[in-house]
Amino acid sequence: MSDDETNDGQRFDRLPATDAERTVEGRATRAEVVDYFTDRFGIPPETFDDYTFWEKGAGKIWIYSGDAPTPIEIEAIGMTCLRTRQEHWKPTTDFVQRVGREASDCVIKLDREQAQRFATGEDQDLEWDGDWGYLIAAHEVAGELEPIGIGLYVHGELRSMVPKGRQRDLES
């Protein structure tokens, strides 16, 4: 196996289009990433037509609007969108806030008080009749449903996954 066929935490590698093109064991494919967002959140696959997906290290997936040579040794390209090398894939807050408006599934609508609590990082007991797992938490603003971030719903509890540095007190 050459250096190009291993994970390198200092280098971005474009995701292979399909499983047949995979050269690094465990690396997600573009098709798997798009299918995940489509199957889990109902985001139309064409949403990703103008984007490329990249992995840096093990399972940190980045989305980039454009093209670049692969592999590429830079600090960042686009934004992180997904963590894949764990039992359950986890979308990032940045991704959800930018692309989450396209989602039709696994979106939990929060009222004002629930949204404020979610933004501060507070976990809360909520009823949800959909799938357990990662959900897009959203709140209506000016007549439009706006994604706040990603939450983990298990056993009747919505756990805020808003990173500590991004948590805000919105009560004032």
Located regions from the model:
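Polybasic, low-complexity RNA-engagement segments
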Residues: 2-172
